[in-house]
A protein has these predicted regions:
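Compositionally biased, non-globular sequence tracts
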Residues: 2-207
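C-terminal catalytic/acceptor-binding lobe
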Residues: 207-215, 221-225, 380, 386-505
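Short, well-formed alpha-helical segments that are part of the catalytic scaffolds
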Residues: 212-238, 244, 248-256
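A structural signal for short, well-ordered beta-strand segments and their strand-loop junctions
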Residues: 242, 297-301, 339-344, 399-403, ...
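Active-site-proximal specificity loops/subdomain of glycosyltransferases
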Residues: 244-301, 306-320
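A solvent-exposed, charged loop/short amphipathic helix patch at secondary-structure junctions
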Residues: 305-323, 415-432
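Conserved catalytic core of nucleotide-sugar-dependent glycosyltransferases
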Residues: 308-391
């Protein structure tokens, strides 16, 4: 146990004070120009949560046109290109004289089964996913002396949403297409896709392992029963710190032995507890700790990241050493104006789509590499990562989000403990049905970001809950600047990573 005497360098700003909000130089809200406070207005706040009339919805993917022809024959339905969703059975059985067997076999016209036009959606409703940069080729001029990165479009033929009115229909459908499914099955491929090979694939290093150059910190609260991020780093034999609160010291001590990770973990007990202001305060304290040990950068992670991946040649494969972190460190340290970087979420990079190796000037989340001389610090109770990145970008500096390296982050609110228990509330309460939004749910955390940056942020209703939308387009003018004397060689450098095809570690 390590109990360093590290004092907080500044009082934490949770951004809940009205006067501080008005004095915030990075917000350009109307209250700066009008007398009196301007209360926030929720965007589309009267929109009700749509109740699905389906018992279940199943996403069915097809690799080829012939696969879809066979599927249509099996379920006896024609699903032309302009149909995105359909019912099974197509007509309500109660309105038919006979059950499932009264259908005349249909003739499937393959020419009508062409794929839908690619549509990346309404970018005005984009939620921190910058699709515009997918085909950006400028990244290639900077991806030098870095690991191989080849990622091309290899998209599936089409996806159809199949809706079921009740369990009986779902079970009949399962028999018809010859696939075993449960009520928890959300998506399938037809024919059934045998996904087995990636389980045995890993990026490994032979001999001495490469370690990250800069210290790593995990901010953790009430997750001593899972410790996903720490277990992942320990499996890669990477030493790291876990910042915890005093009242949970014993539980985390026991967890180190329970999970067999003590050799790689240093517990740091923060000088505060149960403050209710989110992880930003602990992140600032970890920042102070890294400076106290002479570090020039530091990594800070959420505590629910199960694995880290390398994306290359249309495969997302786990890496089992610190080489991926070292490559990211080396890349950003070439530039004089990059202050924050980190890997993209795994679920935002489909293996069959084209992405650049990195995207500059967007939000970095959950796993951040931060330059210690950055003049900004964490603040706010919610969405601190987006706020920190926006302040850096508004200064004309840069952030770098890697697609070549990914993090296997658990979905928001899906893992118990952490901030979920403290102030993130479920969005399925009765208040949504009655009022259209839950005042105690994700709307508060999204609204805070709108208050912080009303010039580039607004509130939107998506996926049955509130989200924030951020326009990163104004920051595309922020250009990466090499440090004087930096001139990377135009060569491939895989940092000793070798693809193991039969990993059993």
């Amino acid at each position: 146990m390590s109990k360093p005497v590290i004092e907080e360098s500044a009082e934490y700003d949770n951004y809940m004070d009205d006067q501080k909000r008005k004095e915030d130089s990075y917000s350009v809200g109307l209250d700066k120009f009008l007398d009196g406070e301007v209360k926030p207005v929720l965007y589309d706040q009267t929109k009700k949560k749509k109740k699905s009339d389906a018992w279940k919805v199943l996403y069915v993917h097809f690799k080829e046109r012939d696969d879809m022809v066979e599927f249509c024959q099996l379920i006896n339905q024609m699903i032309p290109y302009n149909i995105k969703e359909t019912w099974y059975p197509l007509h309500h059985p109660d309105a038919r004289l006979f059950g499932f067997d009264d259908e005349d076999p249909i003739t499937v016209d393959p020419s009508l089964l062409k794929p839908r036009d690619k549509d990346y959606g309404d970018t005005t409703l984009d939620v921190d996913v910058n699709v515009v940069t997918r085909d950006d080729v400028k990244w290639r001029q900077y991806w030098l002396d870095m690991p191989e990165y080849v990622q091309e479009n290899n998209e599936h033929f089409r996806t159809v949403h199949i809706k079921f009115r009740k369990k009986e229909h779902f079970e009949e459908f399962s028999k018809r297409i010859g696939q075993d499914m449960t009520e928890k099955t959300k998506a399938i491929w037809h024919p059934e896709l045998k996904v087995t090979k990636n389980r045995l694939l890993r990026w490994v290093e032979d001999g001495e392992r490469t370690l990250p150059r800069h210290p790593l910190y995990i901010i953790s609260k009430t997750r001593y029963d899972s410790m996903f991020t720490s277990r992942s780093l320990a499996r890669m034999q990477i030493p790291h710190h876990i910042v915890i609160e005093p009242q949970e010291e014993q539980q985390y001590e026991e967890a180190l032995d329970n999970f067999g990770i003590r050799d790689y973990v240093t517990l740091l007990v923060a000088p505060f507890s149960n403050h209710g202001d989110g992880p930003g305060r602990a992140r600032n304290w970890a920042w102070d700790h890294s400076i106290s040990i002479g570090a020039t950068w530091h990594w800070v992670f959420d505590d629910n990241i199960s694995d880290f991946y390398r994306l290359n040649r249309n495969q997302r494969i786990r890496f089992e050493s610190g080489a991926g972190f070292r490559a990211m460190e080396d890349f950003v340290e070439r530039f004089e104006n990059v202050y924050i970087a980190g890997p993209q979420y795994r679920f935002f990079c489909a293996p069959d789509q084209k992405y650049p190796a990195f995207v500059a000037n967007t939000r970095i989340y959950s796993a951040l590499l931060i330059r210690n001389d950055c003049k900004h610090r964490w603040r706010g109770r919610y969405n601190e990562d987006t706020d920190l990145c926006l302040r850096v970008l508004k200064d004309g500096d840069c952030t770098v989000q890697f697609n070549a390296f990914l993090q296997g982050k658990a979905a928001t609110q899906s893992v118990s403990g952490g901030n979920t228990a403290e102030f993130y509330h479920a969005e399925n309460s009765d208040k949504i049905s009655e009022e259209g939004w839950n005042a105690e749910g994700t709307v508060n955390k999204s609204q805070m970001l709108v208050d912080m940056h009303p010039d580039v942020t607004r509130l939107v209703w998506r996926y049955n809950r509130w989200h924030h939308w951020v326009d990163y387009e104004p920051f595309k003018k922020n250009k990466l600047k090499y440090k004087p004397g930096v001139n990377p060689e135009n060569k491939e450098n895989n940092y000793g990573m070798r693809l193991e095809t039969n990993f059993n570690g």
